[in-house]
Curated annotation (Swiss-Prot):
EC assignment: 2.7.1.148
Source organism per UniProt: Histophilus somni (strain 2336) (Haemophilus somnus)
EC class of the enzyme, as a word: transferase
Record's function text: Catalyzes the phosphorylation of the position 2 hydroxy group of 4-diphosphocytidyl-2C-methyl-D-erythritol.
One Pfam family here: GHMP_kinases_C
Reactions accelerated catalytically: 4-CDP-2-C-methyl-D-erythritol + ATP = 4-CDP-2-C-methyl-D-erythritol 2-phosphate + ADP + H(+)
Gene Ontology annotations of biological process type: isopentenyl diphosphate biosynthetic process, methylerythritol 4-phosphate pathway; terpenoid biosynthetic process
Protein name in the entry: 4-diphosphocytidyl-2-C-methyl-D-erythritol kinase
Amino acid sequence: MKNYQFSTALLSSQIQGKKLRFPCPAKINLFLYITSQRSDGYHELQTLFQFLNFGDWLSIEIRTDGKIILTPEIPHLKNEDNLIYRAAKLLQQKTGCTLGANLHLDKILPIGGGVGGGSSNAATALVALNYLWNTQLSLSTLAEIGLQLGADVPVFVYGKAAFAEGVGEKLTFCQPPQKWFLVLKPETSISTAIIFKDSNLPRNTSKRPLAELLTTKYENDCEKVVLNHYSEVEEALGWLLQYAPARLTGTGACVFAEFANEQAAQSAFLDKPEKYVGFVAQGTNISPLHQMIEYLSQQKQTLCLPNNTNSRG
């Protein structure tokens, strides 16, 4: 896996005439507690999302014919079912925008790792196209659209580290320490359904205020159940624990260790067994996507072709 991080210099270098490359950052769950199971089967939780300065890239070039062209195609997945394509079409439908786009995804994050790759891709499509098409929807409206695509998409749309409650829909923005992380992807994929159906999964962890949670040891209620089902995750986590405090993110499969500085994280990364893909990144409380949008706005870099007179808020 490519090992580089988003940076201000890297983001600013993505300006390429009428084509831009927008970051789709990874996220980790610094903690995750399951507080109850509702009558409809959904689980209520308390979790803390933080972005990483590492992720996929989505290249966008505006079209005037209204077509949405997405490359490359993913085997066994029609483009019409891809979250990026669906995000673009939903934005067109919501605003009446007559512009289109060529979209190209440079996939770097591991698929099925629990670091939010698909949700981040969809959010980047919404936020970036809203900027480029000049459709001028608010972040809250974009988040409502994003919720149709996935429960985690609104977090990426808002672009701020957040404490989530309920089934993930209640967000409180916050600023946890921006530590360095080594993230590993074991050679397995997790079935979320298996984890949440397991009778050993904690479902009654006491709800606590954010201030208390931020000052206590971070844990993940899904971790023990995942380790019981997936020995590959248990092995990867055990390796990380030799170097630093480590946990599962979400329901996995990715695990991460936290370090006080980049040097310590990179040193551990160099010892990584070859069978693991992984990367070193720093936590960031402002999404690199929003950092780039802010940079473009300051530079008055306008890539909308004709003004989109058919848009509406």
